[in-house]
Amino acid sequence: MLRIQKISPDSAALETVRQLFLEYADELQENLCFQSFDAEVKDPMKKYGPPKGALFVAYWNESPAGCIALQALKEEGVCEMKRLYVKPAFRKYGIGRALVEQLLEASHELQYTSMRLDTLERLQPAIKLYEQYGFKLINAYYENPLPGVVYMERHEM
């Protein structure tokens, strides 16, 4: 059974978030220091907390299965999807799709009008998922030094 929990600054699940973020980075096998990833792991709510952010953890039969986050960008009405991750053992249950839907709903509630994301070209299942939710390829909206980066955006949240 799937359960998605919105994480608050005082949530006991913050340690679960940290662990999921570390597993995400480990699976990517990329250096994320250009994104201040260490600081993000230390205090996820600084980047993804209220009033302009959101952070969710998915549980499958009460086992942590994945996460997703949202942060505000500098442009008015624009947010960014971050850290979509589902543990490999849970990838057959539609958890990634449910997390994306939860984040889109949160972005609407926070009155964002568009959402951006970046991903790696080699992550084709993720790109296909984003396309199913109306994300389109765009030019780079920030400098990402990793090879094979793909930038996407969805309007009208």
Q: Could you tell me what each predicted segment is?
A:
Residues 87-93, 121-122:
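Active-site acidic-Proline motif in GNAT/NAT acetyltransferases
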Residues 93, 109-113:
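Short coil/turn segments at alpha/beta junctions that flank glycine-rich nucleotide-binding fingerprints
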Residues 11-14, 93, 124:
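Loop/helix-junction capping segments adjacent to catalytic residues or to phosphate/diphosphate-binding pockets
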Residues 3, 113-116, 120-133, 137-157:
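C-terminal "cap" of GNAT-fold acetyltransferases
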Residues 5-82, 87-88, 100-102, 106, ...:
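Acetyl-CoA-dependent GNAT
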Residues 62, 66, 94-96, 134:
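Conserved phosphate-binding and hydrolysis motifs of nucleotide-dependent enzymes
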